[in-house]
């Protein structure tokens, strides 16, 4: 969150008038109470004469492409003569009598923009009337000329301190569990603890916030009929109305300044007020043009497919999980995220409905992510907003708008729902000291909990603590301990470095994982990290049966992307997306592998809450483990395009299903096991080009060419191949026997067998391996040949045989004997014939 130092010190200074702090000290204060700052920066320096001026006369110049005004501005004695200063300006948001900020010749503005006197548009311009952007207060170039309250200072007075150029902006990193700190109210509470200052809640004493609500009448009667439907899970909903405002009244500079320094865009008085209240109190609000609201309001779930145009002028198709605010004419707001164009504030708006609600955090987060629409409002509702602040926020917004744009506040108000009661937590007073190893007194523990906003009762050695409504993250005694330790100073907890146990090296499972990764990398595959999430409709696209094991997915309750809401049971979806992405960017050959855990649902998936103060029982541990998903380690390879690139060394070779199967064998060799393959049908693979990978009698994976329909549906290259194998299902070997080395040479012979097309090459290879005798050391398939001469439905399988003995040099006859024995056995089993 961006917040200026001057605003923080102003809010705390009203209760602590003698408190002064430097930017470095303030930065340390944030860190001391557990908030990291991304950094802080002073407003860019302006040198030279920068003064307050009063516009005395304005002459409209004609004949130019854009409106130009020639102004005479009273800058007192700052120009050395006391005469009116001639300045040409194109802005329209000031008039005669306006107090403005003037940079005179010799001034240098941020960006090294030097001001000098020069003739332009036929008039002498000796200076510049400045906008917020030109002074470094805003990065919005259309921020407009700064107009100050009348009689704010004598013309010619230095303007730097008046417009707040002596300020520093802090970027405070707010963690997801500390939503209350996304406001000046929350941050000043924390800083009061950091610097041991008196804290007065600006939501309780509005004088601290500098807001006078004396003109806001006590509520009486219902303002507008609201139907707050229970399925929306909204806790509270409130509306107040301001009538008869001046729609063109400018937002005062003091408010514009805080909005701009906090990264907000100034729009109009009503909208700026809602943003200011959000920054001050942490309650997001929305302003409707009351004359465009017809009938009552209904807070409901959207209809599936319902359309709505948000304020950013994007038409959005809504989900039935989205919550909307609608009237008799249709949707007016996407609850907790953004309003709509149908009732937005305009230059004709005279009556305003202010809406403040307490939306369900998870519903808001899902809507924001579903529509890729993260707003300042959604950020706060996702983290939790104080449900008790709604009445105060509505009154403050009404008071501010009336003070800026006139009008009156209607006495009627609509307020539905009530704040939920906070749980009372029991904690031993000594618990923080026990955990931290620091002797915290009982008084210290109680004082720190009260600083957070808790109500504390003493019950013997225990404390009964009720967290404040703005701290929904405090649900157990451990949360209370954390608050005490944080505010007392984590840096004061003694550091005791535990003795590190003697290292035992990598475990056998870790060694196997590393060996598999190295082996695949050496084989030409590039490793990627598959995402742990997959699309919700992945297995529908694949056409998997309803009872397929891969559909046993773990659903993520609060996904980062609503379309990727389940944990992966297979690595292939993520890897195939990577192939598509690489091919779309010009890669003609993509050979990837991934080595990662997948997750299969087991049991209810709901973990029991265990007592952290004692060792859980065996039954509790078993229950906990049974609630966790099964997470085996999988390895997958995907290949498309060339496996061997074309070059001076010869023609390239495209990736085929045989390469996918070979990648499985690479994995098996690295793991020290032997794989067998057999033909099967398994989606997403091609029914005729898929092999089951078996370790012993158990199927541990599949490899082959992907199904053409799936290739087309996923925009993959034709004949993309893939392999996936469950590494955890392979027997884990802690040692590998070294191969026996022979001093005698190896003899090579080839064997080509003609078999039916349906006979798997692996089956023939195994028969040769079994029948060729003990002298056979290695057998490999090196060629598959088909031709008309062989006959229809026939193929030739050529194998390379290596023979070697441990005690002598073999003769050709001995090798031929083994070769012929293998051919004979293949003839018996498959009807194979030797090819000349």
Swiss-Prot record:
HAMAP family: Phe_tRNA_synth_beta1. Tetramer of two alpha and two beta subunits. GO terms for molecular function: ATP binding; magnesium ion binding; phenylalanine-tRNA ligase activity; tRNA binding. Residues 420-495 form the B5 domain. InterPro entries: aa-tRNA-synth_II/BPL/LPL, B3/B4_tRNA-bd, DNA-bd_dom_put_sf, Fdx_antiC-bd, Fdx_antiC-bd_sf, NA-bd_OB-fold, Phe-tRNA-ligase_IIc_bsu, Phe-tRNA-ligase_IIc_bsu_bact. The keyword Ligase applies. It is found in: Cytoplasm. GO terms for biological process: phenylalanyl-tRNA aminoacylation. This is Phenylalanine--tRNA ligase beta subunit. PROSITE patterns: B5, FDX_ACB, TRBD. Pfam families: B3_4 (PF03483), B5 (PF03484), FDX-ACB (PF03147), tRNA_bind (PF01588), tRNA_synthFbeta (PF17759). Keywords: Aminoacyl-tRNA synthetase, ATP-binding, Cytoplasm, Ligase, Magnesium, Metal-binding, Nucleotide-binding, Protein biosynthesis, RNA-binding, tRNA-binding.
